[in-house]
Amino acid sequence: MVKGTSSKPGKVRKREVYDAPLHIRSKKIVAPLSAELQQKLGIKRIRVRKGDRVLIVRGSFKGHEGKVTSVDVKKGRIHVEGATLRKADGTEVPFPIHPSKVVVTELDLSDPRRKELVERKKQVVVSGQEG
């Protein structure tokens, strides 16, 4: 007997996320901005990138702040500077953290395209409130 795919809506939605290509999955790696940044930029959430400064708000590293050292698009996790585990042989490995469990406190705007994106989103929010 051939094993078929599920028709349960929850499982179908879950499969869509995990079977999605990487360019779509990378769009799902978003985190909320801190209250100060939200007020300053007029944006509530943004894609997390290497170089952003984040505050971990959930889990065993709660309260830890550091720079994002890498983003694992395939697994949907980020690695934060200083949030590491010590293996049995003494080596340190980065602890994978889900982006929804962090708050972005400082954006890395060294990329002109990202700066442009922030400005564009800001204009959309401002024009949406006026109209």
UniProtKB/Swiss-Prot annotation:
CDD domains xrefs: KOW_RPL26
Gene Ontology BP annotations: translation
InterPro entries: KOW, Rib_uL2_dom2, Ribosomal_uL24_CS, Ribosomal_uL24_euk/arc, Ribosomal_uL24_KOW, Translation_prot_SH3-like_sf
Entry-linked Pfam families: KOW, Ribosomal_L26
Assigned keywords, A-Z: Ribonucleoprotein, Ribosomal protein, RNA-binding, rRNA-binding
CC terms in the record's Gene Ontology section: large ribosomal subunit
SUPFAM superfamilies linked to this entry: Translation proteins SH3-like domain
GO molecular function: rRNA binding; structural constituent of ribosome
Superkingdom in the source lineage: Archaea
SMART domains linked: KOW
Keyword NAD: no
Similarity comment: Belongs to the universal ribosomal protein uL24 family.
PANTHER family noted in UniProt: 60S RIBOSOMAL PROTEIN L26 FAMILY MEMBER
Subunit-structure text: Part of the 50S ribosomal subunit.
Biological function: One of two assembly initiator proteins, it binds directly to the 5'-end of the 23S rRNA, where it nucleates assembly of the 50S subunit.
NCBIfam families cross-referenced by the UniProt entry: rplX_A_E
Designated name of the protein: Large ribosomal subunit protein uL24
Species annotation: Thermofilum pendens (strain DSM 2475 / Hrk 5)
Gene: rpl24
